[in-house]
Amino acid sequence: MHCVSQDSTEFRKLFISFFVLLSVSLISVGTGKLYAAENSGLTFEALYEQQCAVCHGNELQGEAIGVPLVGSDLLHGQSLEEVAVSIAEGYPDAGMPAWSETLTTTQIRTLAVFIVEQRDSMPYGEFNVRTPMQFPEGVVASNKHAFTVEPVVEGLDQLTFSMAILPDRQFLVTEKTRGLRLISADGQQSTMIQGTPKAYHNEENPRAGVGWMLEVILHPDYADNGWIYLHFSDRCEDCNTMSRQFNRAASMNKVVRGRIEGDQWVDQETIIEFDKASYQIGSDIGAGGRTAFDSEGHLFFSIGARSPNTMSGVQDLALPWGKIHRVNLDGSIPEDNPYVGDDSALDSIWSRGHRSPQGLEVNPLSDELWSTEHGPRGGDELNIIEPGGNYGWPLHSLGINYSGSEVNYGRDELEFFRLEDIEMPIVDFTPSPAVSSFIFYQGDAFPEWKNDVLMGTLKSRELFRISIDGRREIEQEILLDDFARVRDIESGVDGEIFLLLEHIEGSQIARLIPESVEIAE
């Protein structure tokens, strides 16, 4: 967090009074959008330690003359916007100044994000990759269904990404640095499929490799044709100017399809690949890598902000990254794609401005494409993806940069910038829980959840249920809290819900099983 650093006694008094009164004087008022860029040299953590820790403790827990900012309710609201507006407008009757007269709007929002992060136990920089999984004991009673959670498959690689469930209830699982694994329905036997595109392992830092296996997904008519699609990061060395200049491997997303015979990958066909000149030397962490089918014979796939700085190229329609693409099932280009005929654009592009897409699904009720996406510090999103839509990165985000500054990269290069040209999320998640994959539940095992979004998270280790009415959220429930890093989610043959859980000491597949327990109204 960047705040204005002033050494005057008056400023110190005002800053202390702000924290003393925050817990009892938050007011709920609408706030304007924040656009002005700012760059100050002092992070929030440093400023807090300098100005406030003596009163409120290093962990915001409170001290002799300062009330705690965590661990208790705030009288006038807990949400990010309520906290931000309270800071900006103040509460003069209680002696709290209007900080909009002292701090920039970006600084105020950054301060609010920091406070809410701490209150929600989602501090910046904590990703819970080593935190043990916590399976609930006994029955979980949610708002509409009771269920239990049980492990089905254990001992998977630490870097799993995707799973598909076959008609015979076997599992296909991608392990980023190892490849494609076939697992029996009872989880007792598994086989690595031979002959798939190669997955690369970085011995020095497995979590920052180049050349990962990403999504596995079954053709809509898999039962008849056996086609399986693989979305992976195609690696090359000494293959373009950037790779040669830095003497590093480069990669870019690629989609193929094939079939499995025994333990062999056969009949491979390339669906789409990009010119080697576009391959990037950054880690595959930002690769995106999700895939979805609609009901009209189209394949969608996502590519995240793959440039080393995660900013450049995302808005450039001549480059593949930072985009969601749409092709026919055989890789040909649909004639109604939004940029067909535009010589300055790739004709596979469906939408742009994507930072780190984590989930991609088609809503069966509307055939609309939906996506989940990571923001920077805050600004995780659940979006409806419109053809030709611009989803903002790096021009705009409801989150903030990791430094605390506003997200506004590249605006000064535009002739003009209008917020109304940016597609806004259906649901914004700030602070960031690190949203992951999701489904629109269609099974019969949990009938009261039908058509709801079931969404995993990584950092916050939660499983969400979100009810949607058309294009708006009407209910949000955390089904599992402090549980595990949920990397993928799928519905099985009988409507049971399977979760792919990621952990550094070995990933797992777990299953939600409905229980006949009466739920109180």
Annotate each language-model stretch with its function.
Residues 127-142, 202-207, 211-213, 221-223, ...:
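Beta-propeller domain segments
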Residues 153, 163-164, 217, 292, ...:
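Conserved beta-strand position repeated across blades of beta-propeller domains
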Residues 42-46, 57-88, 190-201, 311, ...:
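Gly/Gly-Pro-rich "capping" loops immediately C-terminal to redox-active cysteine motifs
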Residues 37-42, 46-51, 97-155, 241-245, ...:
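Flexible coil segments in periplasmic/lumen-exposed cytochrome c-class electron-transfer proteins
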Residues 30-47, 287, 346:
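Electrostatic cytochrome c docking/interface patches
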Residues 151-156, 194-195, 207-208, 272-275, ...:
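Surface loop/turn motifs at the tips and blade-to-blade linkers of beta-strand repeat domains
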